[in-house]
């Protein structure tokens, strides 16, 4: 039985493509559903992309869902 495991870079590229398709901020749960992974795993991938400066999270208010979006590219 072959198990298809995507690398971290493949997952991150998939997330960036997803953001490009929807062209709107989205929640961690939406990314998790798109990837078919747990919210915990999706959050890990999103945090990696955030550290790389490729995406950013919206300002978080108490009790509000975290929204993620593509970082604006400087001119």
Curated annotation (Swiss-Prot):
Signal peptide annotation: none
One Pfam family recorded for the sequence: FaeA
Example of a GO biological process term: regulation of DNA-templated transcription
Domain of life: Bacteria
SUPFAM superfamilies listed in its UniProt record: Winged helix' DNA-binding domain
Entry keyword set: Fimbrium biogenesis, Transcription, Transcription regulation
Keyword Transcription regulation among UniProt keywords: yes
UniProt key word Transcription regulation: yes
Physiological role: May have a possible regulatory function on the expression of the other daa genes.
Name of the protein in its database record: F1845 fimbrial adhesin operon regulatory protein DaaF
């Amino acid at each position: 039985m072959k198990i298809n495991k995507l690398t971290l870079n493949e997952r991150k590229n998939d997330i960036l493509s997803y953001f490009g398709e929807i062209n709107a901020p989205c929640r961690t749960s939406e990314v998790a559903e798109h990837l078919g992974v747990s919210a915990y795993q999706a959050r890990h991938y999103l945090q990696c992309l955030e550290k790389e400066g490729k995406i950013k999270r919206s300002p978080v208010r108490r009790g509000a869902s975290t929204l993620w979006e593509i970082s604006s590219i400087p001119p």
